[in-house]
UniProtKB/Swiss-Prot annotation:
The keyword Ubl conjugation does not apply. GO terms for biological process: translation. GO terms for cellular component: ribonucleoprotein complex; ribosome. Keywords: Ribonucleoprotein, Ribosomal protein, RNA-binding, rRNA-binding. InterPro entries: Ribosomal_bL9, Ribosomal_bL9/RNase_H1_N, Ribosomal_bL9_bac/chp, Ribosomal_bL9_C, Ribosomal_bL9_C_sf, Ribosomal_bL9_N, Ribosomal_bL9_N_sf. One of its GO terms (molecular function) is structural constituent of ribosome. It holds the Pfam family Ribosomal_L9_C. Binds to the 23S rRNA. This is Large ribosomal subunit protein bL9. The keyword Ribonucleoprotein applies. It comes from Picosynechococcus sp. (strain ATCC 27264 / PCC 7002 / PR-6) (Agmenellum quadruplicatum). Belongs to the bacterial ribosomal protein bL9 family. It comes from the Bacteria.
Amino acid sequence: MSKRLQVVLNQDVRKLGNNGDLVEVAPGYARNYLLPQGIASLATPGILRQVEQRREKERQRLLAELQDAEARKVALKTVGKLIIRKQVGEENQIFGTVTTQDVADAIKERAGQDVDRRGITLPEIGKTGSYEAQVKLHPEVTATVQFDVIPL
């Protein structure tokens, strides 16, 4: 079997790896394509240290995001019930619907936190009453927010 070269990718390469990955490739592929195009660099001890430092920074950033999301979850728990006002008709049927934007606005007003409306999951809401919404703050952190729908 022929000798393989270790290179560190400087950008994503389809079917080979992502930016910063250490991969083994055929010497001709590295010498004739990856290195001249600037797509990869030879894996020297200095470059390997740089790659490891980048990975550590990325890991620290992801950990900080997770801790921030956990703190926001605790803050949302302490807020209490949110209030959403809607126009109602007979038998407390609401006109229109309660949207995720309504819940996001209520969270912003009450807790002072910006929440992406696309991360909010609502139950079917047809009448006034108490409901719960799931708010996805991070891929690993979901908070539950209670709210009341009351007449305008």
